[in-house]
Amino acid sequence: MRPLLRGPAGNDDEESSDSTPLLPGARQTEAAPVCCSARYNLAILAFCGFFVLYALRVNLSVALVDMVDSNTTLTDNRTSKECAEHSAPIKVHHNHTGKKYKWDAETQGWILGSFFYGYIVTQIPGGYIASRVGGKLLLGLGILGTSVFTLFTPLAADLGVVTLVVLRALEGLGEGVTFPAMHAMWSSWAPPLERSKLLTISYAGAQLGTVISLPLSGIICYYMNWTYVFYLFGIVGIVWFILWMWIVSDTPETHKTISHYEKEYIVSSLKNQLSSQKVVPWGSILKSLPLWAIVVAHFSYNWSFYTLLTLLPTYMKEILRFNVQENGFLSALPYFGCWLCMILCGQAADYLRVKWNFSTISVRRIFSLVGMVGPAVFLVAAGFIGCDYSLAVAFLTISTTLGGFASSGFSINHLDIAPSYAGILLGITNTFATIPGMTGPIIAKSLTPDNTIREWQTVFCIAAAINVFGAIFFTLFAKGEVQSWALSDHHGHRN
């Protein structure tokens, strides 16, 4: 039997509605079929879009190794001798046709970090624009712009470091609008009892993009040269943009091929949750404690996420001393686990709500706790098992995999508390959550001057502590119902 959607709730206050599951006495509407539906087509295309997005984001970190003259970085070699080198280096035919640049470690840091300085700027504007004109064009142009800029990366590198830094910042500007725009679109497309499934499918593309692009970029660098890394992913992004603009619509009402039944199902499920206000209630938004609960959780989660995303290959190489081929595969493995976990958790979260009558806030709290405390435990464990290579890789993989639970927790709570302003809210939380990407790796580098296991234990413990704090704060102050300021009639509504 297909899942049922609860109908409109009464005008209970927010406190009571926060813990109320599906109402047995409420009018229920049968869910539209999943197969060949417009909403799941949107989720799949969004999945492909975020796959491309993260491939465009992380490909430079791999290509940079091949772009830099190895003689420039010999003095920066900080490989630890605490752990034995457990495998002989593998000699692979290497194509040397790509140009080399004499960039020291500091210059490379600026090149890699410049992305976030653009990324942080367009978060809130992206959410606001998407709430006004729709997310389809904004998200499409964001990925298209990033793809085009990526094609010019080899030229920018030839023109100099400053040009390349500016180009990467421009790519960040383009990518900065994408997540808020996607959230804004789902506010019109995702029925409340399918939010976890639909959003985790779409955003899981980011994890798989990381999994595929890391080793693929390395293969391209070895057997062709680094310039083709940017050409390949740039062209794929342009092809995706054409499909996106052709197939997708901003709302069910404007979709050309959606069935009448599916359109009615989506519209009726959201009719009591969306606001008709023309003015954004900025004051109420910024004073909302449930929003700040998401901000703290998002910031805390991203601290460990970005620390591992940027430094895991370094830890694998300099502490565990894996060779470059093993490093590429093992660094991607945790993100495959996270991708799989996100997909399964989206299904599980909505199943708990529909079949077991779990309230929205209960589901969000449970999945946030598992997705933040679990990774913290295994991250600390990875730092304290020394040179046990198998356990180190296993613990780091489990840590990142468990982070996938959070995708059905705080990550989509914006749509629970204010669906009409979900893009703006995500822009706000992602602005704060980008700060760890700018500062976390720098702090981690400063804490590991001698590159010892004890120093890395400190890095992992700090990340774990921040994760646990964020999980506790979210559990205490998060809400699961639409807030009164997010409704035009200012009456809270059960979600």
Swiss-Prot record:
Gene Ontology terms: biological process: amino acid transport; neurotransmitter loading into synaptic vesicle; response to bacterium; sialic acid transport
Region annotated Disordered, chain positions: 1-25
Reaction(s) the record says it catalyses: N-acetylneuraminate(in) + H(+)(in) = N-acetylneuraminate(out) + H(+)(out); D-glucuronate(out) + H(+)(out) = D-glucuronate(in) + H(+)(in); 2 nitrate(out) + H(+)(out) = 2 nitrate(in) + H(+)(in); L-aspartate(out) = L-aspartate(in)
Bilayer disposition of the protein: Multi-pass membrane protein
Keywords: Amino-acid transport, Cell membrane, Cytoplasmic vesicle, Glycoprotein, Lysosome, Membrane, Symport, Synapse, Transmembrane, Transmembrane helix, Transport
Cross-referenced Pfam families: MFS_1
Topological domains, Lumenal: 63-109, 158, 222-227, 300-328, 387-391, 445-457
Residue ranges of the motif Dileucine internalization motif: 22-23
Subcellular location: Basolateral cell membrane; Cytoplasmic vesicle, Secretory vesicle, Synaptic vesicle membrane; Lysosome membrane
Classification via SUPFAM superfamilies: MFS general substrate transporter (SSF103473)
Keyword flag S-adenosyl-L-methionine: no
Gene Ontology terms: cellular component: basolateral plasma membrane; cytoplasmic vesicle; cytosol; glutamatergic synapse; lysosomal membrane; plasma membrane; synaptic vesicle membrane
Residues carrying covalently attached carbohydrate according to the record: 71, 77, 95
Similarity comment text for this entry: Belongs to the major facilitator superfamily. Sodium/anion cotransporter family.
This protein's name: Sialin
Organism annotation: Mus musculus
